[in-house]
A protein has these predicted regions:
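Basic, amphipathic DNA-recognition helix from helix-turn-helix-like DNA-binding domains
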Residues: 1-15
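Minor-groove-contacting beta-hairpin "wing" of winged helix-turn-helix DNA-binding domains
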Residues: 99-104
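Positively charged, aromatic-enriched patches within helix-turn-helix-type DNA-binding elements
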Residues: 25-92, 97
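Short boundary/linker motifs that mark transitions into or out of structured domains
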Residues: 13-27, 107
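Intrinsically disordered, low-complexity protein-interaction/activation regions
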Residues: 4-7, 86-88, 105-107
């Protein structure tokens, strides 16, 4: 398939509300502001943007972003969600007690 076709471009850009992630350029924008994200933060927000409104367990996020190297009892997911919350202006990531987190897909 031609990389310049609309379908190919749609797959390369994820957007929820005013947050846009360009997979080709590896850039995340919130409105007209570029977010300065680490590799792990980028992987985490990509996971949220691929599953808006869906509750993602800590284990699933840990496995996707960090692989199998980390202790499931680690709070690394919570720490990085905290980093993302500080960088995203607004209440985008909701805590679902006892399960994990979800990206709010509407205001």
């Amino acid at each position: 398939r031609d990389a310049s076709s609309p379908k190919a471009n749609e797959e390369m850009v994820l957007q929820v509300r005013d947050v846009t992630l360009d997979l080709r350029k590896r850039v995340v924008m919130q409105g007209d502001r570029t977010l300065d994200l680490s590799v792990r933060e980028f992987a985490l927000i990509e996971m949220f943007l691929r599953h808006p409104g869906q509750v993602l367990s800590r284990d699933r996020l840990l496995e996707h972003v960090w692989g199998y190297d980390y202790d499931p009892g680690s709070n690394i997911v919570d720490v990085y969600v905290g980093y993302l919350r500080k960088k995203l202006k607004g209440d985008y990531i909701e805590t679902v007690r006892g399960i994990g987190y979800k990206l709010r897909s509407n205001r």
